[in-house]
Amino acid sequence: MKAYKTKVGTGEFPSRCKEEDENVLAKFGNEFGATTGRPRKCGWLDFDEVNQAIKMNGVDHLCLIKTDVFTHIDEPKVYYKKNLIGMPSINDVSIDDKSFSSLLLLIKGLTDVNRISFTTGPKRGEIVWCD
């Protein structure tokens, strides 16, 4: 799953970012429509939706992609139980980075999923497997 959420079209989007963060996510996450080239609506990862998908599909491992985009956001957030949860800025997408490690621990805590992997960039081999 992406480290943030995107949406096209109308309808509710309770985790939508402020415009400044939305522009950063669209730019560094390459979130533009294939046909129109318009930027997609961007928001914070919605753990209410994530937990519903985990429950419905029996997920026991999550792979977080586009985490490198968070290094461009001053105050990243996640959305849980209709509230935004702020996190410290992430300097490096690495388990050695305290802020990034706290994000991984937060995800484990909010989802009850014990295994997480994440990507550090857009290339095929840029994945880190965690236990």
List the predicted regions and their residue ranges.
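Non-transmembrane, aqueous-exposed alpha-helical and coiled segments at domain scale
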Residues: M1-D131
